[in-house]
A protein has these predicted regions:
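Glycine- and acidic-residue-biased ligand/ion/polar-headgroup-sensing regions
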Residues: 60-83, 176-177, 188-232, 244
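A short glycine-rich, His/Asp/Glu-containing loop-to-beta-strand
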Residues: 24-57, 148-200
């Protein structure tokens, strides 16, 4: 059965192709990239562009993680100063700051200049951490994964080792022409210790921005390849999902995962697992 005839692949679409919903609130443009209610998903993702002096209110009843893609913001949690986050001019410049808030936290972020924020949300189980915090670059786990033309930089912002309720997220940078999420892996079934089920969303940026990458999605039922450009989003509810950057262009993606637990146990495609075993 081909990918377009299978429900799994009908759900794996690039929202940017049909245009994400956009609303304006107090001059701030907020783009809803992934709306959980449309698909019964756990993950919500939105993008906010702020000018100097503008404030964004976030948080509330959901667990929230905000990644400062560029710019600087002053952060309040429940009316109390939390600190300052940001400073990079581009996601390709290096690791940035993020803000984590458990359910019941009222966040306010005020931009010191032009700023771009990615806002990830998920319903949190009981026992989520009780305090909001700013995640510094030094708090992240930064690693060079893979080798050769499947080498990439992975910045784990909120991993299993970090206190949170349900959200897992980080950033990956593919050098020009390189693969990531490779060897191909998936996490769509609950079968520990081999695999645990996690939904996932990718948000892409490209440098220079006129370039592109390719997002593959496949399983036993079918396969497809999506051209992804700067600002695109891919939902990954199931299947293997490797990514490659076009020659001459660096590819960034913010990855957000959520499931019933916070373990990251991917299952590698047996047909390609030898690649990892044979690396220097």
């Amino acid at each position: 059965m081909g990918p377009t005839a299978d429900n799994t692949w009908q759900r794996c679409h690039r929202l940017g192709m049909s245009g994400p919903a956009t609303v304006e609130r107090e001059k701030i443009v907020i783009r809803t990239l992934v709306a959980p209610e449309r698909h019964g998903d756990l993950i919500g993702l939105a993008l906010a562009d702020l000018d100097a002096g503008e404030s964004l209110d976030a948080g509330g009843g959901l667990e929230t993680a905000i990644v400062v893609l560029r710019g600087i913001v002053d952060v309040e949690a429940n009316g109390e100063p939390l600190g300052t986050a940001g400073g990079r001019s581009s996601v390709f410049q290096g690791p940035g700051h993020s803000i984590y808030a458990p359910p019941g936290t009222a966040l306010r972020l005020r931009a010191r200049g032009s700023a771009e924020l990615a806002i990830a949300t998920a319903p949190a189980p009981a026992g989520a951490p009780a305090k909001a915090r700013i995640i510094q670059p030094a708090d992240q786990r930064i690693a060079e994964a893979g080798s050769g033309n499947w080498g990439r930089t992975v910045r784990t912002i909120l991993g299993p080792e970090h206190a949170a309720g349900r959200l897992l997220l980080g950033e990956t940078i593919n050098p020009p022409g390189n693969w990531s999420s490779y060897p191909p892996h998936k996490h769509d079934r609950e079968a520990p210790p081999q695999e645990v089920r996690l939904q996932e969303v990718y948000f892409f940026k490209v440098d220079p921005p006129g370039g592109f990458g390719i997002q593959m999605l496949y399983d036993d039922a079918g396969e497809k390849a999506l051209i992804v450009r700067d600002g695109d989003v891919a939902r990954i509810p199931s299947g293997y999902h490797p990514v490659v950057a076009a020659a001459g262009y660096s590819l960034y993606y913010l990855w957000v995962m959520a499931g019933d637990g916070r373990r990251m146990i991917p299952y590698f495609d047996p047909a390609h697992a030898w690649v990892a075993e044979s690396r220097p």
